[in-house]
Regions:
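Extracytoplasmic Ser/Thr/Pro-rich, glycosylation-prone low-complexity segments
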Residues: 1-191
Length: 191
């Protein structure tokens, strides 16, 4: 599979005002919404014309292990797959069954050149308001390249799974071990 590009320049793609908000039923089990792509996205020898956006900070296809809300190390057949993990943690965006601690929204915008999924100031599930916010986005290109941009990340940064894996959970890249911080404000990586 691809490797991470070193010395990546931070490049936020602003979709505010043009993105469509996703409306999740809840923030845990099966909390994904499907987004159609106007192009085929190649990923591990398959091509997809959609992405499933999960409220817990990852995107994927085919919904294998979609109900997993607790992150862990990859590659692993017990984790969601195939998937790209931008910041997979137990996140708590606004949803139809929101608790008082839910905050932030998830938007997407697609065109022929790229697809963007934006986690806009989403909080981590803690049961407490004010636990920090995560402002990051996925960008997918028709070539199969993908990147994650992190605009402003506040709160717990060392508990997320970040990387990608194939549909069997047998191949993938974990960019950081859970327990270590990897992302920071105005940071990007691409594969």
């Amino acid at each position: 599979t691809s490797s991470v590009e070193p010395d990546m320049n931070y490049e936020w793609i602003d979709i505010e005002g043009q993105g469509t908000m996703l409306n999740f039923e809840n923030n845990d089990s099966f909390s994904s919404e499907s987004v159609s792509l106007p192009f085929e996205f190649p990923f591990f020898n398959e091509s997809y014309t959609y992405i499933n956006v999960n409220a817990n900070g990852w995107i994927g296809w085919e919904s294998e292990n979609e109900s997993v809300w607790q992150n862990g190390s990859i590659p692993s057949s017990s984790m969601p797959r195939p998937a790209i993990f931008g910041f997979f943690d137990d996140l708590n965006p606004e949803n139809q069954n929101s608790t008082a601690s839910a905050s932030g929204n998830i938007f997407y915008h697609v065109n022929d050149d790229r697809a963007v999924v934006w986690f806009d100031d989403v909080v981590r599930w803690t049961g407490e308001a004010g636990s920090g916010t995560y402002d990051f986005q996925f960008v997918l290109y028709p070539s199969g390249r993908f990147r994650c941009n992190y605009r402003e990340m506040e709160g717990t940064l060392d508990q997320a799974t970040i990387g990608w894996q194939n549909d069997a959970g047998s191949q993938g890249t974990e960019l950081v071990d859970v327990g270590e911080a990897f992302v920071f404000n105005e940071f990007s990586w691409e594969a």
